[in-house]
Amino acid sequence: MLGFCGAPFTLASYMIEGQSSRNYENTKAFMLGQPAAFDRLVDRIVDNSLPYLAMQVEAGADAVQIFDSWGGSLDARTWRERMLKPVTRLVKNTQELGVPVILYVNGCSHLLELLVETGADVLSIDWRIDPAEAIRRTEGKVAFQGNLDPVTLFAPPEVVQQEALRTIAAFKDAPGYIFNLGSGILPKTPLESTTALWETVLKPQGSTN
């Protein structure tokens, strides 16, 4: 069973913007114009996320995933200055509960080395980064999850099967790999392709039945 929570930047952006945003103008303006206040908000988010995750672990969660849907909109310098410390605190304190932590940052190709610094056990990555590059840059320090483009599921089932197997094979040299999409499943995704995907993934590798 997988527990989850939103990451500090994503939750802060929803609080400040009031909705999804393309450019996060209000959030970034607040972060740049009132950095101390922004940091206090982020710390408060972490303070409240920790007991929320603890309750999920107590209820039986075997692992926890932290979702930063919008964190990739930050450049590497800003992510290091504003997000590295609070996200690391969230990761480390959750690991102390005895469960592994998966960290997902959408659009993370420019942040990989920083994400490793958080100490997360697994990095969940989107489809924009080559698996071999991700493995090389993280130097065997983390396992991976994800990487398949959700739009793939709109292709014919046989193509979906091929792409799933290709993705799994691409991570053969990683310390570990959890198959998943590189982002959330899209509305109107064809059921037959979804079924083909999971039948392929759940079949023991090398099996022909």
Enumerate the predicted regions with their spans.
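Active-site loop segments of alpha/beta catalytic cores
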Residues: 1-209
